């Protein structure tokens, strides 16, 4: 008899802080690939898109810890990593450095991992030790036969570790008596802008919706020095959080309907070139206040990215319990992001080269984000992406 494993990925976007690590380049490759995959299935006229590639990668890395053979190879391919002997330690080091840099100065970053195991299910000692020591995910015995109680227990843990921003991650019916193990990875971040927006300058203005029409939205206004750049198809604005190397980058298409084309060009080397070409400018910025969330299954996306074997009953997760009787039933994702005058809260080729802006410093530069755009929250030291997404409907 085979049983299934469920991965839960409760994300709370809000700002982000990252540090350099051997795991970061692979996470960025995964971040770009995941964005393109999800964007292909959710066009800008269909709504917002929010994900945390860091959280997804972390949860899948925990799963990789117990995978063997072709199943392990598929997960490794999906997360775009070269998972050598020191890989899990590198992921742990990245999380530790993030937490160290993020907290303080009014900012808060919390990363929490959980391992929920059916009572009486014996685990391999090496798997359990790696989960406990590197991923800080202690084993919690739970009775999945008591389905509703198990669901509520894990949902309560998720809410607790996301400042109550992620509620009811598991809907009724998503956990059943066949569940044997649940992996959870939760992130909460609150970051204050280095240069806050004055609420007195916030006013209601029209935003061009992805599906056509407009919505009346509160826009924050500020004229200040920002890192700014342009590509032939987009403007790029970077807003920093105080006391950290983390920034919020907006990729704003130059046309109202240009986001889909821009999203197709998102690749690690493209983003690196764009962000690396930014320069300080005095910019008149108009940014919408918004609060949005995404909730969807990642199962189909991850299958397309190479790990279909993990979802089959023939999967090899013998590194978890010593037997080949486990497979992944679902990978659930839920994300939240809120941007306001004070900061951010969240529980994320061609035309690579930047071109020089032919302008004098005193010339007027306007950045008006009044139509669908993409955003990234990343560490500017390593370039690692913690959160990414698309805003197409600010009122959603």
Label each PLM-derived region with a short phrase.
Residues 1-145, 156, 360, 380, ...:
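Detector for small/aliphatic-rich hydrophobic stretches
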Residues 213, 382-384:
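Residue-level signal for well-ordered, solvent-exposed loop/turn and beta-edge residues enriched
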Residues 366-371:
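Short loop/turn motifs at secondary-structure junctions and domain boundaries
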Residues 374-377:
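Generic short beta-strand
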